[in-house]
């Protein structure tokens, strides 16, 4: 498909600087631009590429002022990255979508399927399970008995939803992610550890995206809940009875222990670890590899292990870098003091 700068600008409410009739048919990074491609510039580190890019159209923020001639047609918008997302979404929606049940898929006789669903080869839908309209199950995706998946969802290969668990509308579950596996519950006894049956469920609300090989365990009792708009990267562990607030985002390898409650609009860097049975407030930012042993109030920014206020951590880090120099200075001072003591005692 081909679109003109004028059509694109109207769709994203942008202002054209250049040829409104310039046309594009593909996307490209600004540093890899080719004729007929549309690119974007939002990070100042990439500004120098705009003067040499071969892309036909470039999305830029409204405050961008070129320092030299730009050959590409510019479309100025409030947020270039956000506008790119809208265009990419439109592009994805324009792709043909498969529907129907492949002969090699298994759908239980008691399962309920919505309109225009796609069940790929070797996908499985269990007894009493429900699949909403326009939802796609890719090869080997599994929806367990009496589980429910909403409308406009995509389950990529080997995504698994265990029995009785609930997934809302407009959700994306990437390859290998698991919703509703047993929580890590074992009771110690003289003979070892006895398994505690996990009789709860996991609930994934609307507009959630879950990365590859991420696990959201079912609750011991009640529900593990991932609220609306949450975005989880690959390789994340959400333990039993955890609750993740709306629109929170987490980078890869985050681990959250059981029964911890995370607020709304939080941002966690990679490899953050949260202890169990704690509460994290709203709009909390936690830097990569931080270990959080206790409650965190709303709007705090923390770093380190154990995690502390981010500004204090940075100050401590600056001192830490100087420890060898400080040690040398202290050692020299100690020797001077010992010499002074000897002289005073003569």
UniProtKB/Swiss-Prot annotation:
Pathway info: Bacterial outer membrane biogenesis; LPS lipid A biosynthesis
* Source domain of life: Bacteria
Q: Which SUPFAM superfamilies match?
A: Trimeric LpxA-like enzymes
Keyword Lipid metabolism found: yes
Q: Name one GO biological process term.
A: lipid A biosynthetic process
Known EC number = 2.3.1.191
Keywords for this entry?
Answer: Acyltransferase, Lipid A biosynthesis, Lipid biosynthesis, Lipid metabolism, Repeat, Transferase
- A single GO molecular function term of this UniProt record: N-acyltransferase activity
Q: Which GO terms describe its cellular component?
A: membrane
Give the reactions, separated by semicolons, that this protein catalyses: a UDP-3-O-[(3R)-3-hydroxyacyl]-alpha-D-glucosamine + a (3R)-hydroxyacyl-[ACP] = a UDP-2-N,3-O-bis[(3R)-3-hydroxyacyl]-alpha-D-glucosamine + holo-[ACP] + H(+)
What's its top-level EC category? Answer: transferase
Family annotation (HAMAP family): LpxD
Oligomeric and partner information: Homotrimer.
Query: What protein name applies here?
Result: UDP-3-O-acylglucosamine N-acyltransferase
Organism whose genome encodes this protein? Phocaeicola vulgatus (strain ATCC 8482 / DSM 1447 / JCM 5826 / CCUG 4940 / NBRC 14291 / NCTC 11154) (Bacteroides vulgatus)
